[in-house]
Curated annotation (Swiss-Prot):
UniProt-annotated stretches for the region Disordered: 313-370
Cell location: Cytoplasm
Protein name: Eukaryotic translation initiation factor 3 subunit F
Keywords annotated in UniProt: Cytoplasm, Initiation factor, Protein biosynthesis
GO biological process: formation of cytoplasmic translation initiation complex
Regions of compositional bias (Basic and acidic residues) in chain numbering: 313-328, 348-370
CDD domains associated with the record: MPN_eIF3f (cd08064)
Cited function: Component of the eukaryotic translation initiation factor 3 (eIF-3) complex, which is involved in protein synthesis of a specialized repertoire of mRNAs and, together with other initiation factors, stimulates binding of mRNA and methionyl-tRNAi to the 40S ribosome. The eIF-3 complex specifically targets and initiates translation of a subset of mRNAs involved in cell proliferation.
Domain MPN span(s) in chain numbering: 31-170
C-alpha cells in the first residue's frame, strides 16, 4: 500500500560552503549595525546612476569586527561596489572590490570583511550568486558565513534593515553556485551617542529647506538650542505628570519607573552651585569661541601676508629683468669705450687744442779735425 509523504526540504547547518582543510564556525546570532554604516548605504543609494541601462539597486561590502567565537558581528563601515544587472546576468567589478577592501583593511587593520548589502528586499538567483561569492574561501568570509544586509530606500518609506546568512540548498552540483537558502538572523542598531546625535540633527536640519542645506552652528548657538530642547522636554514631562495626578491621563508604570531612575541620577546640589557651574561653563565656551576666531583670523592674515610677499618678489624680479634688458641694449655703442668709463658712466670733458710748436732749424755738421 502506498503511503503518502509530505514534501520536505532538508537543510544543512547554516554555514559557508565547506572546503577541505577548513573548519567552519557557527553562524552569527546577532548583527549590530552602526548608524554611520546605514548613512553610508543611504548616501550610495541617493547618488546611484538612475539611467535605464543601470540596475535599480546598488550593492556594496560590509566591513566591521567579529567576536572571537563568531557569534556576534558589528558592521562599522561600508563601501560601494560597481555592478551591472539585467534579466539574464549580473556582473560585479571584482578587481575594484579587492582594491577597496585592501585599502579599507590597511586603514583599519582590526576590521574584516563581513558580507555585502543591497538596497532591495528582493532575494533572487542573483542574490544567491553574489552571496556565494562573498562566502567563498578565495574572495569571501570563509570559514565564517557572509552576512547579507537588505534595506529599502524608497522615498517616504521607513528604513527597515534585514540581515540574512545562507545555507547550501542546491539540488545538483551544477547549480550550487547560483542557489542557496537565506536564513534571517536578528539584528540591532545601538542608540546613538551625543556626537552622533548632534551630527544627525545637523543633517536633518536641511530637510525643510528647498536647497537641502543646513548651516553649521557655533558652540554658543548649539548650547542655546540644546537648552531650549531641554526646557521643552521638562515642560512636556511636567504636563504629563500633572495630567496623571489630576486623573486626566492613564498612568504608565514603565514611564514612571523611567522618570524615577533618571531623577535619581540627578546630582544633589543647590541652585546656587548649579548657577555658578553653568556660568563657568558659559565662560569656557565663550573663551573657546574667542580663541577659535583669533586663530582663524591669524591664519587668514598669515595667508594674506604670504601672498603679498610672493607678489612683491615677482614684481621686483620683473623690474630687475627689465633693467638688465635696457642695460644690455646700451652697451657696445662706442666700440672703443673703456669698460665702465669713469665710474658711473660720466662723459669726458673736451680738451683745449694745443698751439703748434715752432720747427727748429737744422744745425750744420761740424768738420772733423777742428
Amino acid at each position: 500500500m502506498a503511503v503518502d509523504h509530505d514534501d520536505f526540504l532538508h537543510l544543512s547547518k547554516p554555514l559557508a560552503p565547506s572546503a577541505v582543510g577548513f573548519n567552519a564556525n557557527v553562524a552569527p546570532l546577532t548583527v549590530t549595525i552602526q548608524p554611520q554604516a546605514i548613512l553610508s548605504i543611504l548616501d550610495h543609494a541617493v547618488r546611484r546612476d538612475i539611467r535605464d541601462t543601470q540596475a535599480t539597486r546598488v550593492i556594496g561590502a560590509l566591513v566591521g569586527v567579529r567576536s572571537e567565537d563568531g557569534t556576534d558581528v558589528e558592521v562599522r563601515s561600508t563601501f560601494a561596489i560597481p555592478h551591472t544587472e539585467n534579466e539574464d546576468q549580473v556582473e560585479v567589478d571584482v578587481e575594484y572590490q579587492k582594491n577597496m577592501l585592501a585599502l579599507t583593511l590597511k586603514a583599519s587593520p582590526r576590521e574584516s570583511l563581513l558580507g555585502w548589502y543591497t538596497t532591495s528586499h528582493e532575494l533572487n538567483s542573483f542574490s544567491a550568486l553574489i552571496q556565494n561569492f562573498f562566502a567563498s574561501p578565495e574572495t569571501g568570509t570563509f570559514p565564517h558565513p557572509a552576512v547579507h544586509l537588505t534595506m529599502s530606500t524608497d522615498p517616504g518609506a521607513d528604513i527597515e534593515p534585514r540581515c540574512y546568512i545562507s545555507a547550501p540548498a542546491a539540488v545538483s552540483p551544477d547549480r550550487a553556485a547560483e542557489s542557496c537558502f537565506f536564513i534571517q538572523v536578528p539584528h540591532r542598531t545601538p542608540p546613538t551617542n551625543e556626537s552622533d546625535r548632534a551630527a544627525l540633527e545637523a543633517i536633518a536640519a536641511g530637510k525643510d529647506d528647498e536647497a537641502r542645506t543646513a548651516p553649521v552652528l557655533s558652540d554658543v548657538e548649539a548650547l542655546a538650542r540644546s537648552l531650549e530642547q531641554t526646557i521643552d522636554m521638562l515642560d512636556r514631562t511636567s504636563e504629563y505628570v500633572g495630567a496623571v495626578l489630576d486623573e486626566e491621563r492613564e498612568p504608565s508604570h514603565a514611564l514612571g519607573q523611567y522618570l524615577m531612575n533618571n531623577l535619581s541620577l540627578a546630582p544633589k546640589v543647590d541652585s546656587v552651585s548649579i548657577e555658578h557651574d553653568f556660568n563657568n561653563h558659559i565662560q569656557d565656551v565663550l573663551m573657546v569661541s574667542y580663541l577659535t576666531n583669533t586663530i582663524r583670523t591669524q591664519v587668514d592674515l598669515a595667508q594674506r601676508l604670504a601672498l603679498a610677499n610672493l607678489t612683491d618678489k615677482d614684481e621686483k624680479k620683473e623690474g630687475e629683468d627689465g633693467k638688465a634688458e635696457r642695460g644690455g641694449g646700451g652697451r657696445g655703442g662706442r666700440g672703443g669705450k673703456r669698460g665702465g668709463g669713469r665710474g658711473g658712466g660720466q662723459q669726458r670733458e673736451p680738451r683745449e687744442p694745443r698751439e703748434p710748436r715752432e720747427s727748429r732749424e737744422p744745425r750744420e755738421p761740424r768738420e772733423s779735425g777742428e
